[in-house]
């Protein structure tokens, strides 16, 4: 059995109980996932190169691990890895991508259990399921499942369906035997019973080979890699220190006056120039909070456009609001990266 983990968000840890014996499991993971996850699979794990910049940074300072290509979910990664192993056929059995009546997540999943924790006599399970589905509003879509039964999905879930269709369309060895949800266009869609009857007449355990991974020295940290991490931590500490100085000067008391706003905006401009002196650091910060950086780019573009249209207009308040929001983005990004780079030194 193989476990796939790709999401660097700390929330990913909640999907693992860390009590189950993992000696018979193989972890295939993005190196940017929380460290507790690969640590739970000693000697039984394979990392693959990811497209996020944090993973690229690790590749640059260690070694290439191999790439599964562009992936958008655990399921896509699993299919890609199965193709890498030359598995045939590859049978999908869990890609419902729709609601089961009003239930979104499968039983015993992290999200479903979290949902069930809210159940009470006054607010039963059906109440919470209705609240969940009602949040999607105009994003709800309708379709037919494999057996001609009407199902409800969302635009987001349909996008995952489209990715499967685009990547695996026309492949005769990728079979979708998920009996709920909208069938995946371009691949073979048949019932699970048919798949088992046609393709699974021989027990896998009778013909499988033991999957061996390279024995690793858990305590070995290559010195060049360690030095790279230490340099990056120092750069992040410098940025964090400059942010703290700006906070003490302009943000710890009441809203600054005009002069204070001018100095804060100027201080942030100097900080941007400092960050951009090291492209790696800038990309790492952006990779942690891409949405925050996008908001800054959008706000900055709007301000520059207004200045082009009217050279005499004062946009100090807008510049201050732009930089104030981005200040929090930089603080969060720098703190997160510092903590996790420091963790990397201890494992």
Task: Place the predicted regions along the sequence by residue.
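Acidic/Gly/His-enriched mid-domain segments of enzyme catalytic cores or analogous surface patches
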Residues: 1-88, 306-347
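Polyanion-binding loop/helix "lid" in catalytic or ligand-binding cores
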Residues: 72, 122-180
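Active-site gating loop/helix substructures
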Residues: 46-48, 52-65, 107-112, 117-150
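A structural signal for short, well-ordered beta-strand segments and their strand-loop junctions
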Residues: 28, 90-94, 101, 173-179
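Acidic, Ser/Thr-rich peripheral helices and adjacent loops at domain boundaries
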Residues: 4-7, 18-24, 108-128, 192-203
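Conserved catalytic-core helix/loop/strand module for nucleotide-ribose chemistry
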Residues: 21-54, 133-148, 263, 270-307
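Long, compositionally biased charged/polar accessory segments in the mid-to-C-terminal portions
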Residues: 159, 168-347
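Glycine-rich phosphate/pyrophosphate-binding loops
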Residues: 1-3, 7, 82-108, 300
């Amino acid at each position: 059995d193989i476990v796939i983990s790709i999401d660097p968000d700390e929330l990913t840890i909640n999907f693992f109980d860390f009590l189950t014996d993992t000696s018979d499991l193989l972890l295939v993971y993005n190196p940017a996932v929380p460290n507790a996850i690969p640590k739970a699979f000693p000697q039984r794990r394979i990392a693959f190169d990811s497209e996020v910049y944090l993973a690229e940074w690790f590749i640059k300072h260690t070694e290439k691990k191999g790439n599964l290509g562009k992936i958008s979910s655990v399921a896509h990664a699993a299919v890609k890895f199965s193709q890498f192993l030359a598995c045939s056929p590859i049978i999908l059995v869990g890609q419902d991508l729709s609601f089961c009546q009003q239930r979104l997540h499968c039983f015993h999943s992290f999200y479903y259990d979290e949902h069930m924790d809210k159940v009470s006599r006054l607010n039963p399970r059906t109440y919470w399921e209705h609240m969940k589905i009602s949040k999607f509003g105009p994003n709800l879509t309708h379709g037919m499942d494999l057996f001609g039964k009407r199902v409800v999905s969302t635009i987001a879930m349909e996008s995952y369906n489209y990715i499967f269709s685009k990547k695996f369309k026309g492949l005769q060895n990728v079979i979708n035997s998920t009996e709920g949800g909208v069938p995946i266009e371009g691949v073979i869609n048949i019932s699970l019973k048919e798949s088992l009857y046609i393709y699974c007449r021989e027990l896998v355990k009778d013909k499988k080979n033991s999957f061996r991974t390279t024995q690793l020295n858990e305590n070995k940290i290559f010195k060049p890699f360690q030095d790279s991490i230490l340099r990056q931590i120092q750069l992040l500490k410098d940025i964090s220190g400059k942010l703290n100085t700006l906070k003490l000067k302009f943000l710890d008391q009441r809203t600054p006056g005009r002069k204070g706003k001018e100095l804060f905006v100027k201080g942030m401009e100097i900080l941007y120039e400092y960050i951009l002196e090291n492209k790696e650091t800038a990309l790492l910060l952006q990779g942690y909070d891409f949405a925050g950086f996008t908001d800054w780019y959008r706000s900055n573009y709007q301000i520059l456009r207004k200045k082009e249209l009217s050279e005499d207009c004062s946009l100090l308040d807008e510049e201050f609001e732009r930089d104030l929001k981005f200040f929090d983005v930089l603080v969060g990004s720098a703190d997160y990266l510092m903590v996790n780079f420091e963790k990397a030194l201890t494992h």
